[in-house]
């Protein structure tokens, strides 16, 4: 099962699936300048989605949709959690206050991952919340690649071209298969952007989010791009 958002482009058309929180707000900004668009979501009367409330459209179904000749291009998205095992995240005084010993043990190095096949059309980049400041955007041909926040990279001395490892998190509710995967990814680019309001947990900070290719995000949950 793939957890995602699809953007179908016909003169830059967009289809969004399971848009939540800040992503939903960014997506609303995106829609302002997009025409010929329509949206699709799972039917929550018969499909409640993932434990954390995301959609779960299968990759094989996406393929059927995108075979329509009227669709010029598309963007699909997978939300995941990936651990930078052994490395600390960016913290603020507020997030430190909420970092209990139990949370630190289970999620102390957990990045919020968005897997996407075209990062230039990812909501937060389109809305301006994120800005690529070094390197290149992810494309459909990328595999084992990541875009990382420049502040997190600077904290650990990482630069474009360096390799880092992401581990599955067995405590993540959406890791329903209990996957224990490790994916070595190459930093393809660095982005900037900061929250405009206070946050409770470190994973809500833009600095602790990352964009990867679809393959990487899916593998962290024990899936492939098509399942």
What is each of the regions a protein language model found here?
Residues 2-12:
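Alpha-helical transmembrane segments of integral membrane proteins
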Residues 32-75, 79-227:
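Basic-flanked hydrophobic alpha-helices used for secretion and membrane insertion
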């Amino acid at each position: 099962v793939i957890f995602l958002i699809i953007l179908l482009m016909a003169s830059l058309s967009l289809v969004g699936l399971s848009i939540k929180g800040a992503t939903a707000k960014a997506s609303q900004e995106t829609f302002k300048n997009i025409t010929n668009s329509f949206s699709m979501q799972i039917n929550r009367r018969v499909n409640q989605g993932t434990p954390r409330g995301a959609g779960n459209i299968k990759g094989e179904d996406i393929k059927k949709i995108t075979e329509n000749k009227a669709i010029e291009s598309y963007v699909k998205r997978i939300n995941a959690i990936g651990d930078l095992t052994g490395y600390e995240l960016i913290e603020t005084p507020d997030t430190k206050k909420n970092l209990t010993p139990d949370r630190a043990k289970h999620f102390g190095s957990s990045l919020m991952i968005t897997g996407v096949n075209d990062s230039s059309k990812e909501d937060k980049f389109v809305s301006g919340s994120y800005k690529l400041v070094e390197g290149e955007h992810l494309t459909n041909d990328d595999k084992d690649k990541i875009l990382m926040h420049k502040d997190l990279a600077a904290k650990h001395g990482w630069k474009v071209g360096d390799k880092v490892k992401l581990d599955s998190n067995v405590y993540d509710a959406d890791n329903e298969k209990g996957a224990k995967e490790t994916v070595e990814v190459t930093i393809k680019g660095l982005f900037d952007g900061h929250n405009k309001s206070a946050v409770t947990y470190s994973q809500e900070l833009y600095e602790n989010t990352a964009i990867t290719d679809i393959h990487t995000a899916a593998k962290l949950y024990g899936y492939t791009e098509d399942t």
